[in-house]
């Protein structure tokens, strides 16, 4: 499910097995080189869908008020629960995933990791994003959680502006194959401010800091609270 420039969204009681992302929340899908390749000499677009992209780019539709709950996710390749990276300078806020189960995730690379992920990209801002009461089974690969700055799928090669108020609460991973989760700001300006982690467990053991074997938090993440 790709939700593009949507607001006031509820997803509940679904079972999803997808090759790509199970649920992704973004501004719109497209890259500058694609738009250029489908623009005629008179300035018209040869792909009709680009008119939608152009309209959204001009009007800056913010993305907010999502609840994704009571779902079971299996992703053969990509993320299970993703916010970003296509943002195009708009604001993402008030997004909550809760009471979901992850059966499978196999994506283990340096750009797109994370059964749960926030990709802070494309000049967007990201605020009040929560993952709560999530069970992650012994996935084949990838990370349980990842929040980081990237310019993947960014129209102008831009990273995100900032992120704040990210919550992980009652996250239970059981298994041995997931690689360590990470939360990474990019620099002093492009930072993550306000992270709350409560009862994040790996094989029943609580994760209590950001420098252990299961979670890395870098110096550009501020105001981190472990509950």
Protein language model regions, located:
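Extracellular/periplasmic carbohydrate-active domains that bind, remodel
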Residues: 1-227
């Amino acid at each position: 499910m790709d939700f593009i420039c949507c607001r006031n969204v509820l997803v509940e009681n679904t079972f999803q097995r997808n090759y790509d992302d199970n649920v992704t929340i973004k501004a719109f899908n497209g890259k500058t080189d694609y738009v250029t390749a489908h623009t005629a000499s008179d300035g018209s677009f040869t792909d009709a869908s680009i008119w939608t992209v152009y309209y959204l780019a001009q009007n800056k539709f913010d993305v907010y008020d999502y609840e994704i709950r009571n779902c079971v996710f299996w992703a053969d390749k990509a993320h299970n629960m993703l916010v970003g990276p296509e943002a195009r300078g708009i604001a993402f806020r008030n997004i909550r995933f809760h009471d979901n189960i992850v059966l499978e995730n196999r994506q283990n690379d340096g750009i797109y990791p994370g059964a749960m992920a926030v990709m802070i990209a494309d000049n967007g801002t990201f605020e009040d994003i929560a993952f709560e009461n999530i069970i992650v089974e012994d996935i084949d690969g990838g990370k349980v959680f990842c929040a980081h700055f990237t310019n993947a799928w960014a129209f102008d090669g831009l990273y995100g502006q900032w992120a704040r108020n990210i919550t992980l609460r009652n996250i239970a991973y059981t298994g041995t194959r997931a690689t360590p989760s990470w939360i990474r700001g990019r620099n002093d300006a492009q930072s993550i401010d306000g992270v709350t982690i409560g009862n994040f467990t790996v094989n029943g053991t609580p994760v209590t800091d950001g420098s252990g074997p299961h979670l890395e938090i870098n110096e550009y993440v501020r105001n981190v609270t472990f509950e």
